[in-house]
């Protein structure tokens, strides 16, 4: 069992667990985890770049423009989707957990996230001021790079220095050493992970508010500026259930997200039963047959990510 502690990294833990299960089975490994801190480091750095570049791209728009407002309200977060796992891991690779372990800030992200967000907002205002003064794009890009070096340093202080090369010993299920080799994060990904995450997986969604059997893309919901937006095929829940059952039967890990924040009783581990208790208390259900309207009322904005067969 892996534990994200007090952080929003469920998407990352789940994505890594899908690859982790395959690595353990393929190489007959004993106790093994990929480092969650390593890709999280670069996820935060890439999101900082996404924000700053977004500020440059919208610098001609007024501060009360909806996009500009949204950027300053959401400079970065520790949440994400499988698209982020694919984009970050394919670019930066993977390392074992003992090479870059958890830190207090990775397990409790709120303080670090708040400080980085504060710095990014400050930097965003500086970039807008420079753009208003007529500074050329090349100079803005240079300033942005300098700003990112500050964010990099903040991440190092909180998460540690990401390794570029490391020596690691593989142990089998009996605890016996099998091999000791020198790796880079990308060579480790090639041997123990999945180099083609972007090509090998498709995201599915049950979104009752939109037409089924079509592909949808959520603009600016990505982890890298040059990455892929959150893109999914919208299917009826019955179709997704069939795929989930098939994944369980053939022991293939299936990454999934669900909107567990609604009517959740975390003490009892129940989801949905809270609706019944609310009806007993209040005399009526809360939108029990109107889930298709949830997105329109901003009632369906955050999901929880897990993998079948292994808790995240």
Task: List the model feature ranges, each with a label.
Residues 1-6, 12-299, 312:
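Structured alpha-helical subdomains that flank or immediately precede key functional sites
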Residues 302:
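Short coil/loop residues immediately preceding or within conserved phosphate-binding loops
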Residues 306-308:
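Residues located in well-ordered beta-strands
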